[in-house]
Amino acid sequence: MTKPLIRLGTEFLYNPYPVYDELRAQGPVHHVLLPNGLSTWLVVDYQLGRAVLAAARVGKDAASIAPITTRLRGEHDGMTAVSTDLWKHMLSSDPPDHTRLRRLVSKAFTARTVDQLHPRIETLADELLDRMAGAPEVDLIEGYALPIPITVICELFGVPEADRNRFRELSTTMTATSAENVEDPDAADSPFYATAAQRAAASVELATYLIGLIAERTENLGEDLLSQLILANHEGDKLSDQELIAMLFLILVAGHETTVNLIGNGLLALLRDRALYTELTAEPERIPAAIEEFLRYEGPVHVSTLRYTAEPITLAGIDIPADELISVSLLAANHDPGRFTHPDRIRIGQAAKGGHLAFGHGIHYCVGAPLARLEARLAFEKILARYPDMRLAEAVRWRPSSTFRGVQSLPVVLE
C-alpha cells in the first residue's frame, strides 16, 4: 500500500501537535512535504519510531542522502565541497564508519570528563543569576539557557571567548529553516530562516574557522577536549583532519543548540505550572526525574535527522521504495497515547530515563546526553533556589523549525 503526499504548512513549524494528532489518527507513518520543500516519510508512532531509529536497513550516510535531497528538491542546495564536509560526522554515517568514529570520540567524552565540569557549571549558573539581580525583566534564553551550554562547550574545546558570538550566529544560520517557498510573513526578518546561499556561506565560514582552530591546537596541545580528540586513537587509528572538522562542528552545534532548548523548554513548562514550580523548589531532589519528563513533554529536537531507505521496506503496511527519506518525529513519538498515559500533561515519572526518544535511540543515541542532563539539572537547581517566585512576563513564540523545538525568547519577571 502507498500513501498520498501530505503538505505541511508553516503553522506546523510553530505548533505541530494538532497536525500530529490528525496524522496519528490516520496511521503511524505518512508521506509528507515539509515546509522547507523536502518530502520524507514521517513516523509519528512511538514503537515504530523507536524501531526505525535502530533499523539497520535505514541508513544515515551523508554521501547517500545528498543526491536524494537534491533529487527531491529538484535543485542543488548550494553547499560547496568545503561546507558539505561539515556533515560527514558520526551522526551522518553508518557502520563500520560510525562505529569507528564513535569509539574514537567516546574516548574524549568520558563520564570522568563530564563529572569534572560540575563545579564550573555551578559557578557559571551563579554568575549568570548574579547579573540578572535587580532587573525588572530578563530573557532567560539570552541570559541563562543559552550562555550555560555555549560557554561550557566552547571552553571544553578551547574556542576563544571573542569568537563565541560569531560562532553562535553561524550556528543559527546553518540550522535555520529554509526561507525558500515558505509562507511566513516573519521569514524575511527572522534569524531562524535562511536561504540556501546564506546557509552555504555560513558553513564555509565556520569550516574555515574550524580548520584554523584545529591547526593552531595541533601545534599547541593542551588539556581541552579538542586536544584530546586530536590525540584520540584506537589501535593506531586516529581521526583525520576532515573527520576532526566534522566532529568538532557536530559537537559544538549539537552541544549547545539542544541544551538551550532543554533548559528553556523546561523552564517554560515550570512557569506554566505553578504547583510543579513550587513542588520542585521545595524538593530539588526530584529535578532529575522532572528533566526526563521535560525531555518527553517538550523535547529539544522536533524531527530526527534524516535517514534513507537503503532498500525497499514496508512500515506498518506501507511500501516505501529504496532511496526515499525517512524521519521520526520525536515530538509525536513522545506524545503517543499508546505509550504514555498522559501524553499532553507533565507527570513526573511517566518518562523515566530511557523511556522517551528525546535523545534518539540505537547506535546514534546522543553521546552528549550525560552532559546535557548535568547542565540542565544544575541550571534548574540554581534558578529555582534563587528565584522561587519567578513568573512569565508575556507570551512566548516558538522557533519555526522542524529540526529543533525551542522558544525564541523567554521573558520573565524574577520576583
Segments (PLM) and residue ranges:
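Cytochrome P450
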Residues: M1-E415
